[in-house]
């Protein structure tokens, strides 16, 4: 019996590493939109992040604070989520014309990384939109509870993006 207890003591879970905590606290959504529109037109439209007001149902406003849309451009995004209004400052971190744009948004409770990857396909253009949300501080405890609401928002944004791109 003593040996069995010693084995249990050694099998105790170890604290999570910073990487493991970050993975656990990060929520990832990925949606694909395919439209019968030219790649250049789709890229030009979506790389202007102020257009989120057209297709993201949570966005109230997105204002270009500084920059020409390229790397380093800053956008102030005001969104409503579960009845609360919040602001994130997004910075364009990567922009490869016609291929990819990656933005990072921050506020005191959340870091969001939004990546849009573009590909010409027979039907027109395919956009793969990936959003990763990493919660900070006490908000980390709410992450698992918010997952269903974020998934709903992702589906609504996918539909909104599809509709907006079809208007181009």
Where are these regions (language model features)?
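Hydrophobic ligand-binding cavity/cleft-lining segments
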Residues: 7, 19-64, 70
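Compositionally biased, low-complexity flexible segments
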Residues: 11-13
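Hydrophobic/aromatic beta-strand elements that line small-molecule binding cavities or substrate pockets
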Residues: 31-33, 88-94, 113-120, 131
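Beta-strand/loop substructures that line and gate deep hydrophobic ligand-binding cavities in soluble
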Residues: 104-156
């Amino acid at each position: 019996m003593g040996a069995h207890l010693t084995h249990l003591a050694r099998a105790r879970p170890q604290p999570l590493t910073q990487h493991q905590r970050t993975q656990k606290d990060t929520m990832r959504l990925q949606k694909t939109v395919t439209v019968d529109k030219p790649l250049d037109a789709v890229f030009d439209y979506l790389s202007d992040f102020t257009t989120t007001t057209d297709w993201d149902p949570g966005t109230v406003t997105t204002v270009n604070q500084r920059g020409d849309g390229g790397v380093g451009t800053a956008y102030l995004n005001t969104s409503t989520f579960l009845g609360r209004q919040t602001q994130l400052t997004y910075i364009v971190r990567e922009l490869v014309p016609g291929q990819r744009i990656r933005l990072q948004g921050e506020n005191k409770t959340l870091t969001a990384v939004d990546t849009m990857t573009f590909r010409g396909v027979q039907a027109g253009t395919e956009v793969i939109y990936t959003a990763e949300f990493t919660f900070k501080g006490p908000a980390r405890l709410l992450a698992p509870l918010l997952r269903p609401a974020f998934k709903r928002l992702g589906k609504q944004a996918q539909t909104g993006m599809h509709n907006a791109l079809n208007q181009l």
